[in-house]
Amino acid sequence: LDTLIDDDVNNWETMIDTNIKGFLAVLRIVSKQMVKQGSGHIINIGSVAGVESYAKGGVYCATKHAVHAISQSLREEMVEHGIKVSEILPGAVNTEFSKVRFHGDDQRAQSVYQGFEPLAAEDVAELIVYNANLPYHVNLAECLILAGAQSRATKIHRKI
């Protein structure tokens, strides 16, 4: 993550290709199949960055805002086909994401999680399973899930 003027354009292209174009390509295939079968439940994984922007995250936040907007739009389009669309918006989750964004720098990646207990991938997975198992008449349309020490995208209470 870097400022807009200092970031590498190749990073932008990778984020846009992955977080928007890749997301749309998969979503289109899945949506078409669900419309054919007349039912389904699409659960998209967005990010707190899709509803809150922050410094040095402009392009990443923009791609996650796109996921959020597409999820909302698709929910409107799919409801008449009997298809639910939900979005899970995780905050700080201890995954390989930090290692990727810091280009393999393990020390820098682990520093992101110092002084607090982040969410684990299993925490997010449990929410997805819960959402998927709700009765058809219930749609948990959007769910922001944060670590207990996190109140906003970049506001984390650290005990160091």
Regions found by a protein language model. Give the residues of each.
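Active-site helix of classical SDR
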Residues: 27, 63
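Residue(s) in the substrate-gating loop at a strand-loop-helix junction
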Residues: 47
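C-terminal helical subdomain
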Residues: 87-88, 95, 107-154
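A short helix-coil junction within the Rossmann-fold of NAD(P)-dependent oxidoreductases
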Residues: 2, 29-38
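Substrate-binding pocket helix/loop in short-chain dehydrogenase/reductase
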Residues: 2-4, 8-13
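Alpha-helical segment proximal to the catalytic Tyr-Lys
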Residues: 32, 76-79
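Active-site loop immediately N-terminal to the catalytic Tyr-X3-Lys motif
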Residues: 5, 54-58
